[in-house]
Amino acid sequence: MSQVMGVLNVTPDSFSDGGEHLAVEAAVARGLEMAEQGAAVVDVGGESTRPGARPVDPAEEQARVLPVIEALADRLGDRVRLSIDTRHDSTARAAVAAGATLVNDVSASLWPVAADLGVGWVAMHMFGDPRTMQDEPRYDDVVDDVRRFLVERAGAAVAAGVAEVWVDPGIGFGKTTVHNMELLAHLDVLVGEGFPVLVGTSRKRFLGELLARSDAGQAPYGPAVVAAPAPAVDPVPVTDRVDGSLTTAMWAMIHGARMVRVHDVDVTVQGVAVLSGSIPAPEDPLRSPA
């Protein structure tokens, strides 16, 4: 059965919930709520990686996340895993010392840290960095380019001794809406490489664009639209993207994703419960290829 990772942004500027959980008490309360709703993992992040986001100094990042991770580790024990969403070596190490057991790495570069500390590691694909990643991202073949990058990084992690390696195609990270849809449509290509796949589509801009196109009576994205784009429309607000988020999370799980990263844990857990009755669970969802 697929797992649900709950997003806990301890930031002032995240695209979906920036500022909502900046206070330690609010962040801890939200983490406990997601655990109660059925999240298998609570992913704590202290640096926004939305398009155009400013870099955050690791010391500032750690000041945001470490008290939250420590409090959640104390309250949750082994019932729910804690993950650190970071691209900084020092933050990953400090978070693991505070209780995190998974490094969710948007830079796909921290496998030596995971190997050293004996924790799990997620390699995510990103074109460029958050400041520039949406500046006309281009690929020869987005599905194959992402696959090759992630397989190379995951292979390096396995060779270094990381026992638990996940791969994430990085939906929305240096990709157009068409790129995102192609990656979802061909998720089986990445799943077929044998590493457990994590997918995060929750509340992202491409969903807002798709929903706005539908509301405006425009055709869905496809070859004809790419060749002759319809007039641009403003994406629907973040708060109106829950249904689209759930739909794409269900699609990802049906097509082999072992974990989905979401803001709306409660409805996603319900979706997992429905799917679990009809889709056999893998024998070992954390298996890495030999």
Predicted regions and their residues:
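Conserved Motif II region of HX4D acyltransferases
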Residues: 170
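N-terminal glycine-rich anion-binding loops that anchor highly charged ligand groups
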Residues: 2-6, 32-46
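Proteins enriched for Cys/Gly/acidic motifs involved in redox and nucleic-acid/cofactor modification
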Residues: 1-2, 7, 13, 153
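Active-site-adjacent loop and "lid" segments of alpha/beta metabolic enzymes
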Residues: 12-33, 49-75, 81-82, 87-89, ...
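Structural motif
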Residues: 3-5, 164, 196
